[in-house]
């Protein structure tokens, strides 16, 4: 699992930042999954809106968060010289882009 490998990487003083990135990414994956479940339960849009009247605002915030993570991973990919870390960050970037795309797909189905 890419998150497990990232959590084991030692990046000196930035290991705390890396752990924060992993936590945020896991949170985004859970959010993506909840959007997917709402889509699967068709007609759950009303329930989603009732449960969280500000769900569009929350969705916007999650997209900002994932864009920030994507940029952060791209930056780390550029500055990393270790090939193992480069591969790990490339895989993380691919996973982030997939999660972002799935969130977009689910959100368009809910709107």
Swiss-Prot record:
GO terms for cellular component: host cell nucleus; virion component. A motif (Nuclear export signal) lies at residues 2-11, 75-84. Keywords: Host nucleus, Host-virus interaction, Transport, Virion. Pfam families: Flu_NS2. GO terms for biological process: exit of virus from host cell nucleus through nuclear pore. InterPro entries: Flu_NS2. It is found in: Virion; Host nucleus. Its main location: virion. SUPFAM superfamilies: Nonstructural protein ns2, Nep, M1-binding domain. Average number present in a viral particle is estimated to be 130-200 molecules. Binds M1 protein. May interact with human nucleoporin RAB/HRB and exportin XPO1/CRM1. Belongs to the influenza viruses NEP family. Mediates the nuclear export of encapsidated genomic RNAs (ribonucleoproteins, RNPs). Acts as an adapter between viral RNPs complexes and the nuclear export machinery of the cell. Possesses no intrinsic RNA-binding activity, but includes a C-terminal M1-binding domain. This domain is believed to allow recognition of RNPs to which the M1 protein is bound. This is Nuclear export protein. It comes from Influenza A virus (strain A/Teal/China/2978.1/2002 H5N1 genotype W).
């Amino acid at each position: 699992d890419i998150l497990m490998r990232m959590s084991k990487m030692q990046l000196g003083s930035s290991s705390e930042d890396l752990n924060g990135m992993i936590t945020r990414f896991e949170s985004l994956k859970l959010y993506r999954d909840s959007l997917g479940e709402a889509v699967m339960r068709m007609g759950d849009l009303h329930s989603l809106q009732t449960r969280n009247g500000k769900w569009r605002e929350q969705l916007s915030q999650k997209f900002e968060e994932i864009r920030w993570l994507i940029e952060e991973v791209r930056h780390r990919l550029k500055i990393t010289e270790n090939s193992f870390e480069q591969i790990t960050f490339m895989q993380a970037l691919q996973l982030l882009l997939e999660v972002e795309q799935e969130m977009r797909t689910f959100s368009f189905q809910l709107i």
